[in-house]
């Protein structure tokens, strides 16, 4: 591309005074700041910056496995979305499964996660189908950013219920829907 490499600068300093100076005194020199770091840094930038920022505090991300999903693909996607790097804000924190696939999919998908050290929080209904260890999910789990090898599992009746759950508890960061058939226009296109 023909973008001048000087348009983007990386500030490699952990000195908070440098950050404070950029946030409060550099508005005429800096177009936008993209903070990368922990919640405390991002929160500080959001609260104090006089410079426009692109940032977020949390990533409560969802992966919905729809009734027409293919098991092998769903297992790969869920595994990658949760286990590739559990401590990033883009990792899946809640897996939502359509009720029609829980019996067939849960032991493969959740078993793979558990085998790789992931703690599973699920509803009472999940225990009817999943043979591994389940910790009882509470309301708090739906809005928890674990940032670790833990995941909550929600069972829903349909796509609309999945979308409602994502919209209620998610941070609109990194959500995915796994399905085999894609028809447009669909609620998948506009409601998450």
How should each PLM-predicted stretch be described?
Residues 33, 98, 162:
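Residue-level signal for inorganic ion chemistry
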Residues 71, 158-159, 181:
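Residues at or immediately preceding the N-termini of alpha-helices
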Residues 42-148:
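ALDH superfamily catalytic-core signature
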Residues 27, 89, 168-171:
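Alpha-helix termination/capping residues and helix-transition junctions
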Residues 88, 174-181:
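A short, aromatic/hydrophobic, helix- or strand-capping loop or linear motif
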Residues 95-97, 148-157, 172-177:
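Short, well-ordered beta-strand elements within core beta-sheets of diverse protein domains
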């Amino acid at each position: 591309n023909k973008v001048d490499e000087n348009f983007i600068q990386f500030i490699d300093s952990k000195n908070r005074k440098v950050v404070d100076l950029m946030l409060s005194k550099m508005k005429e020199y800096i177009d936008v700041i993209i903070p990368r770091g922990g919640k405390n840094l991002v929160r500080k930038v959001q609260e104090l910056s006089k410079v426009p920022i692109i940032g977020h505090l949390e990533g409560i991300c969802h992966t919905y496995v729809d009734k027409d999903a293919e098991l092998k693909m769903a297992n790969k996607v869920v595994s990658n979305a949760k286990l590739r790097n559990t401590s990033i804000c883009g990792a899946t924190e809640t897996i939502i499964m359509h009720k029609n696939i829980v019996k067939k999919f849960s032991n493969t998908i959740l078993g793979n996660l558990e085998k790789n050290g992931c703690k599973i929080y699920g509803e009472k209904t999940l225990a009817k189908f999943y043979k591994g260890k389940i910790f009882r999910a509470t309301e708090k789990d739906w809005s928890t950013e674990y940032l670790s090898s833990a995941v909550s599992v929600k069972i829903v009746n349909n796509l609309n219920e999945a979308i409602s759950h994502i919209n209620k508890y998610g941070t609109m960061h990194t959500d995915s829907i796994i399905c085999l058939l894609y028809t447009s226009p669909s609620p998948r296109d506009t409601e998450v």
